[in-house]
Amino acid sequence: MLEQTDLSLEQLLKNYYETTNEKIVFVNRQGKIIAMNDAAKDILTEEDNYNAMTNAICHRCEGYSNEYDVQSCKDCFLETTQLQHSNFQVFMKTKDNEIKPFTAMYQNIDEQRGISAFTLQNVAPQIERQEKMYQQKMLHRSIQAQENERKRISRELHDSVIQDMLNIDVELRLLKYKHRDKVLAETSQRIEGLLSQLIDDIRNMSVELRPSSLDDLGIEAAFKSYFKQFEENYGMHIKYDSNIKGMRFDNEIETVVYRVVQEGVFNALKYAEVNEIEVSTHSDGKQIVAEVVDRGKGFSLDHHPKGSGLGLYGMRERAELVNGHVNIETHINRGTIITLDIPI
């Protein structure tokens, strides 16, 4: 019974050795390779006659990570006993001459004959995922900081600068009525007009930065305010349809929806050459979907209008931060549909 179990274990180990993606190499005490599985041949090929080369692994190794350096040959793992039976990161050159990171283990398995096993697992995909997660985390922090600063400046403009200017306007009107001088009255009238225009411009800038209604009342209120201002400033009619009414969502989701729609509307204004844009926001309780539709010029996704590329890329980046997705459907002379969907 024991023999049968041993044979079964031997067969299992043999199957693992032959089929695993883990690269397994056996070397003697001189550093000559005496055996390796097929997976290891991505790095060490039989044509190179590595079984006759002393310290064969060194010829493909680009260093390992230690406590001092990311890539180093100092205190080589082939010579030190400190790394025995422990995992470490090593950089190996593949047969295609690409340098890739691996999680490695180098351990003596037969002291009497001086045989050691060197195993490698490719960690490039994990590192790429970690880098992407880190980039997304940094992007999230950057956008959050940007939105917070927009909010601060917007409120400062609305609560402080505009109020001060309104006070100046009141003082100017009082001055005009106190002194009945014709020239003074005409000058005051002109200054009032300039001041009124400046107040409107600052109000618009405040809303562009970040409307207070987005934080206080939600998406629908923010859009109604923004679209009204947009129509007054640019003469572009926006047809808005929504079923979200007073519904509130996570602050980050509301910000993404607002910014993506804002970018889509502004792109349509600049490039579509239309008089009307259709915007819709709907939710079924499981997701929120926003659409920006124009019946204008359209464009090729491979050759989008100059200046719009960063905006389209920014839409997708923002959407990814809340596990959302942006789809752009466009046809020359038929228009563009930008669809954002976010799970909630």
UniProtKB/Swiss-Prot annotation:
InterPro entries: HATPase_C_sf, His_kinase_dom, Sensor_HK_TwoCompSys, Sig_transdc_His_kin-like_C, Sig_transdc_His_kin_sub3_dim/P, Sig_transdc_His_kinase_NreB
EC number, UniProt record: 2.7.13.3
GO molecular function annotations of the record: 4 iron, 4 sulfur cluster binding; ATP binding; iron ion binding; phosphorelay sensor kinase activity; protein dimerization activity
Record note on modification: Autophosphorylated.
Reaction(s) catalysed by this chain's protein: ATP + protein L-histidine = ADP + protein N-phospho-L-histidine
Main location: cytoplasm
CDD domains on file: HATPase_UhpB-NarQ-NarX-like (cd16917)
Cofactor binding summary note: Binds 1 [4Fe-4S] cluster.
PANTHER family attached to this UniProt entry: NITRATE/NITRITE SENSOR PROTEIN NARX-RELATED, NITRATE_NITRITE SENSOR PROTEIN NARQ
Cellular compartment(s): Cytoplasm
Function field: Member of the two-component regulatory system NreB/NreC involved in the control of dissimilatory nitrate/nitrite reduction in response to oxygen. NreB functions as a direct oxygen sensor histidine kinase which is autophosphorylated, in the absence of oxygen, probably at the conserved histidine residue, and transfers its phosphate group probably to a conserved aspartate residue of NreC. NreB/NreC activates the expression of the nitrate (narGHJI) and nitrite (nir) reductase operons, as well as the putative nitrate transporter gene narT.
Cofactor entry: [4Fe-4S] cluster
Presence of keyword Cytoplasm: yes
Pfam families, alphabetized: HATPase_c (PF02518), HisKA_3 (PF07730)
Keywords of the record: 4Fe-4S, ATP-binding, Cytoplasm, Iron, Iron-sulfur, Kinase, Metal-binding, Nucleotide-binding, Phosphoprotein, Transferase, Two-component regulatory system
Phosphohistidine: residues bearing it: 158
Binding site for [4Fe-4S] cluster: 58, 61, 73, 76
One Gene Ontology cellular component: cytoplasm
Domain Histidine kinase: residue ranges: 147-344
Taxonomic superkingdom: Bacteria
Protein name: Oxygen sensor histidine kinase NreB
